[in-house]
UniProtKB/Swiss-Prot annotation:
EC number: 4.2.3.-
Disulfide cysteine pairs (residue numbers): none
Enzyme class: lyase
Residues noted as binding Mg(2+) 2 in the record, renumbered to the chain: 357, 361
Motif (DDXXD motif): 357-361
Gene designation per UniProt: CAD
Free-text domain note: The Asp-Asp-Xaa-Xaa-Asp/Glu (DDXXD/E) motif is important for the catalytic activity, presumably through binding to Mg(2+).
Keywords: Lyase, Magnesium, Metal-binding
Record bears the keyword Phosphoprotein: no
Protein name: Sesquiterpene synthase Cad
Entry similarity comment: Belongs to the terpene synthase family. Tpsa subfamily.
Length: 603
């Protein structure tokens, strides 16, 4: 890497003055412009900010506590006549509330319910349908495993060995496509298998078995006009793996499924059926909660678009202007009203880092980039004197954005944030400069070289740390050391997801270094398909590590920080699911953004 010295004025001047701006041949990736017009975002309006809707939510919360939880919270001493499925009922209620995104209103009640059910969980025998009988079925155990594990209770997947026969099947498959109870059990098994830690082979076997059966059921019902809600739910779960089922997207889809569930398939027809009046209250709360949060997002999008409209960099046409897409990525995971500052921070830093990424990867020349990197690291405006105007504009934008965030972060967490931010900032600038030098020299690095530079250049460390510092919660003094392992796992996963989707586009833009290309270089004779298959295997194993970090991380860090990292990865997996939906904001991605951020759900 070219040395980033104390001063690059003469270096920049000597090289840049040799050619006028018109003579410099710049690479341009021809990204499409920002698709979210200022006027459109400023026009967003919603009635759900009115106090009456918040009052209605509070009423519904109290009614649900009385109507549903009063019968579920407590043990046998308070409930002398438990139903024939009281444990399954508890798991079902918690699962529905979490799928609909309203569980935060019932934290105390949910903990009491799960503490009760956990007393009956046995890692060898599993759990029965009810506290008063010994009937053990696959659906209850699969749903219970998923709910308990996601809520940080230790449960072993060994219970599923009780349901696996010598042929590897977990259920009698006779007429399973027409038998809703069997199909529901298969769906619960699949959803449980998605919450897999490394080396849990029984869950991998369960996933393979359940996914094969569920895909057969989908194919069998493909031509039906009036599909059951259970089949619609199966189609959704199989189309969007848990890897990319970000919370707000999950909520939107489950509201649709729950609302259309007139045949009570979600309520496990024939086993447990929730009374319609209780279902109606839960659905009303979920829709109101979604719309009220969306009203908050409308207000934030107005702030964000106003901020962007007042910048000078918006006039530059060589980079991806994706501030709304960044906001969407973050809001899908951390959506609560009190996290407004961190959402806006993520979108602003994302817009800044994308600008710098496109300068270093595509638009800038190496003669410009070396002094530019020094200026960014040292915040030295004097270095910019002999650099082109577009870089001066970008430097001023970077400096202002960085300092605004640093000022706000210091108010919350003290002066220690200055070093944290600068160390992370320096790392990404140097990593991007390294990438630029490889491009300039047409150099394809070794896999080791690539990983040392490309993981920091994913932008994960900067985006996550800067946003985290605007979360108003108490951090341990050694928070940076504690998040390192989690952060590295997310960065590595995002790098693989990114490279596996857009390596061909980047190669056409002159960016030959991607994990795919480096792996093929290091393994002569490997085809691109083989390299992609290997990348997908690494993505899957890395996600298993992420799941374990999310649920049982070895260090004590605030739960909001764990959510930030975990859902940041899932948001990237979501937007890169089929294509690089970030660089190419397709109609499908725009429609998804509208569903979550723009269009209310009507009753």
């Amino acid at each position: 890497m070219a040395e980033v010295g104390l001063s690059q004025n003469s270096y920049a001047s000597a090289n840049h003055d040799k050619k006028s701006e018109q003579q410099i041949r710049r690479r341009v990736a021809e990204f499409h412009p920002n698709v979210w017009e200022y006027e459109f975002l400023q026009s967003l309006s919603s009635p759900y900010g009115a106090p009456s809707y918040c009052e209605r939510i509070n009423i519904l919360i109290e009614e649900i506590k009385m109507d549903i939880f009063d019968g579920l919270v407590g043990d046998g001493e308070k409930n002398m006549n438990p139903s024939a499925y009281d444990l399954l009922e508890r798991f079902f209620v918690v699962d529905i509330l979490q799928s609909l995104g309203i569980e935060r209103h019932f934290k105390k009640e949910i903990k009491a319910v799960l503490d009760y059910t956990y007393k009956y969980w046995n890692d060898e025998k599993g759990i029965s349908l009810a506290s008063g009988n010994l009937i053990v079925d696959l659906n209850t155990n699969a749903l219970g495993f998923k709910v308990l594990r996601l809520n940080e209770y230790y449960v072993s997947p060994d219970v599923f060995q009780n349901f696996q026969d010598e042929m590897g099947q977990f259920i009698d498959l006779e007429n399973f496509k027409e038998d809703e109870s069997k199909l529901r059990s298969l769906l619960s098994l699949y959803r449980a298998s998605e919450i897999c830690f490394p080396e849990e082979n029984i869950l991998k076997q369960a996933k393979m078995f359940a996914s094969t059966c569920l895909r057969q059921a989908i194919e069998e019902n493909r031509e039906l006009v009036n599909k059951s809600q259970l089949i619609i739910e199966v189609e959704y779960i199989m189309k969007y793996p848990w890897t990319c089922r970000v919370p707000r997207w999950e909520v939107w889809n489950y509201i649709k499924i729950f609302r259309g569930d007139t045949d009570a398939s979600m309520c496990m027809k024939g086993v447990y059926e929730m009374p319609s009046d209780k279902r109606t209250k839960i659905l009303e709360l979920a829709i109101l909660d979604f719309n009220i949060l969306q009203d908050q997002h409308h207000n934030e999008l107005k702030i964000l678009s106003k901020w962007w409209n007042e910048t000078k960099v918006k006039e530059l046409n060589f980079f991806r202007q994706r501030h709304v897409e960044f906001y969407f990525l973050y809001a899908c995971g951390l959506y609560e009203k009190e996290l407004s500052a961190t959402r806006l921070c993520f979108a602003k830093v994302g817009a800044l880092i994308t600008l710098l990424d496109d300068i270093f990867d595509t638009y800038g020349t190496i003669d410009e980039l070396v002094p530019f990197a020094t200026a960014l690291i040292k915040w030295d405006m004097s270095i910019m004197n002999h650099l082109p105007e577009y870089m001066k504009t970008c430097f001023q934008f970077a400096y202002k954005t960085y300092m605004e965030i640093a000022t706000e972060a210091e108010k919350i967490h003290g002066p220690c944030v200055q070093k944290w931010m600068h160390d992370t900032w320096k790392t990404i600038i140097l990593a991007q400069l390294q990438d630029a030098e490889w491009i300039a020299n047409n150099y394809l690095p070794s896999l080791t070289e690539y990983l040392e530079s490309s993981v920091p250049s994913t932008t994960v460390p900067v985006l996550s740390l800067f946003s985290m510092l605007l979360i108003d919660t108490i951090f341990p003094d050694d928070i940076i050391e504690k998040i390192t392992k989690f952060q590295s796992c997310v960065a590595w996963g995002c790098r693989l997801v990114d490279d596996s989707k857009d390596f061909q586009d980047e190669k056409e833009h002159g960016e030959s270094a991607s994990w795919i290309e480096c792996y093929m270089k290091e393994n002569p004779g490997t085809t691109r398909k083989q390299a992609l298959d290997h990348a997908n295997m690494l993505i899957e194993s890395n996600f298993e590590e992420l799941i374990k970090h999310r649920i049982f991380y070895e260090y004590c860090i605030p739960s909001t920080c764990k959510r930030l990292y975990f859902d940041m990865y899932r948001s990237v997996a979501f937007i890169f699911k089929d294509i690089d939906g970030f660089s190419k904001s397709s109609k499908a991605i725009r429609d998804d953004i509208k569903k979550i951020l723009v269009e209310p759900i009507y009753f």
